Amino acid sequence: MSRALLRSVLELRTPVTRLPPSFLLPFRPAARFLHQTAQQVEPTSQSDAAAAAATLLKASPPKVTTATTPEAPAAVPTSTPFSQQPPISQQVKELLPVLAAQPGHYTTIHIHGKPYLVTEGDTVKLPFKMPGVAPGDVLRLNRASVIGSRDLTLQGAPYVDERLFECRAIVMGTESEPMRVMIKKKRRCRKKKHVFSKHKYTVLRINQLKINDVSSL
């Protein structure tokens, strides 16, 4: 036998120990090793720590906080004091005694923003129930836009100075209206709803309407 034939026969008898190509092998990530070095801190003695704490306390003094109570808002005055009101003009001082001497005074009083033309002895039925009043209380009405008589009229801008007149009313009581029944119904619906209402009104009587004297102002 030739040498080439003998060599091929020997290769067939021996087991194959060769590895497959690299692209057929399973993927294995490369192992990475991280080396961490612990930081070594030199221990300090207890005396050094106490001295450092004492210096920190001396350098930063303790802060003292005081609790402050919130201040209540100042109440808005309903009427201006007489000392803060502007002076009365000379023309008003001259004509005010003439107006006071005439009979039959009338005034337009404003109560809760609504005007009422009244004279002394009139009864006013307010369209609401005034809170905080009881029968027998006397109220001073200091918002008047007009004060006049048959010949003279004093017009305010928008109100007459409250030092020029005095208008007082006494609370007579409260009146209630008859019971109202309102029927509410929707279209294409047989159901009806009855709403009952009965409002109350405060009644006042003007018992004083006087124009003050100029000398007392």
UniProtKB/Swiss-Prot annotation:
Location of this chain's protein in the cell: Mitochondrion
GO CC term (a single one): mitochondrial large ribosomal subunit
Subunit structure and binding partners: Component of the mitochondrial large ribosomal subunit (mt-LSU). Mature N.crassa 74S mitochondrial ribosomes consist of a small (37S) and a large (54S) subunit. The 37S small subunit contains a 16S ribosomal RNA (16S mt-rRNA) and 32 different proteins. The 54S large subunit contains a 23S rRNA (23S mt-rRNA) and 42 different proteins.
Spans annotated as Disordered: 61-87
UniProt cross-references to Pfam families, sorted A to Z: Ribosomal_L21p
Major subcellular location class: mitochondrion
Superkingdom of origin: Eukaryota
Job of this protein: Component of the mitochondrial ribosome (mitoribosome), a dedicated translation machinery responsible for the synthesis of mitochondrial genome-encoded proteins, including at least some of the essential transmembrane subunits of the mitochondrial respiratory chain. The mitoribosomes are attached to the mitochondrial inner membrane and translation products are cotranslationally integrated into the membrane.
Swiss-Prot/TrEMBL keywords: Mitochondrion
Family statement: Belongs to the bacterial ribosomal protein bL21 family.
The name this protein goes by in its record: Large ribosomal subunit protein bL21m
Keyword Cytoplasm: no
Gene Ontology molecular functions: structural constituent of ribosome
